């Protein structure tokens, strides 16, 4: 079931459908931000990372037409700032999807990412009919952990060696929300300052387990 990809805005932040003509800008941002993004990038354990941006965008668009994803470009004051992808969309009895994102280093600290995530999550809940939205984050990715803390995504557990990132299988913390928790929406709750403080709290046992896994994976 294909869902039309909207253009959504709040203040200086816009998320819109990614387009083939974004390929050159997307490639430039990824290359210019290699040091900033490489350690968080999903990688293919069976092949090299591809920088064929047009092919990547076509794949995202085909996935969207099949009803499995919503690929967005993120803009700040009209300037290309990053990407947000809603993926693994499942309808019916599960009604679930996953969010992934990145922004260029020069845009960090401007609340662009939480705003983009809130816009996308509210759309998925209230327009696309999703019931549950999930974000999985590497334990050492402090800026991304701050995003789920700001928006009140609930911590749901540690997933061991879950996604291949930067050349190896990495542990991830899992956070989620369900639509019943948010009658006013994610963005409004954040802007109103009513996000529960403890939602994103990670149990100490999981912090220790992730830390041990990281040391073992680094050969320490």
Where are these regions (language model features)?
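Residues that form generic nucleotide/phosphate-binding pockets
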Residues: 29, 40, 56-59, 63, ...
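A short helix-loop-beta-strand connector motif used in the catalytic cores of GNAT acetyltransferases and
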Residues: 45-47, 58-73
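Short, charged low-complexity intrinsically disordered segments located at boundaries
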Residues: 52-63, 87-91, 152
């Amino acid at each position: 079931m294909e869902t039309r990809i909207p253009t959504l805005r709040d203040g200086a932040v816009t998320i819109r459908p990614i387009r083939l003509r974004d390929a050159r800008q997307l490639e430039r941002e990824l290359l210019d931000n290699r040091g900033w993004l490489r350690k968080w990038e999903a990688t293919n354990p069976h092949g090299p990372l591809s920088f064929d941006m047009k092919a990547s965008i076509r794949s995202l668009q085909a996935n969207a037409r099949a009803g499995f994803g919503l690929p967005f470009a993120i803009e700040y004051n009209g300037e290309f700032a990053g990407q947000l992808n809603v993926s693994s969309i499942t309808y019916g009895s599960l009604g679930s999807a996953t969010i992934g994102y990145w922004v260029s280093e020069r845009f960090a600290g401007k609340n662009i990412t939480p705003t983009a995530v809130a816009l996308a999550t509210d759309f998925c809940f209230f327009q696309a009919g999703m019931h549950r939205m999930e974000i999985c984050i590497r334990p050492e990715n402090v800026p991304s952990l701050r995003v789920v803390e700001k928006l009140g995504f609930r911590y749901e557990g540690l997933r061991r060696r879950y996604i291949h990132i930067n050349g190896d299988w990495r542990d991830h913390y899992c956070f989620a929300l369900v639509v019943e928790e948010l009658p006013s929406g994610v963005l409004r709750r954040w802007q109103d300052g009513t996000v529960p403080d403890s939602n994103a709290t990670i149990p100490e046992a999981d912090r220790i387990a992730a830390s041990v896994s990281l040391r073992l994976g680094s050969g320490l």
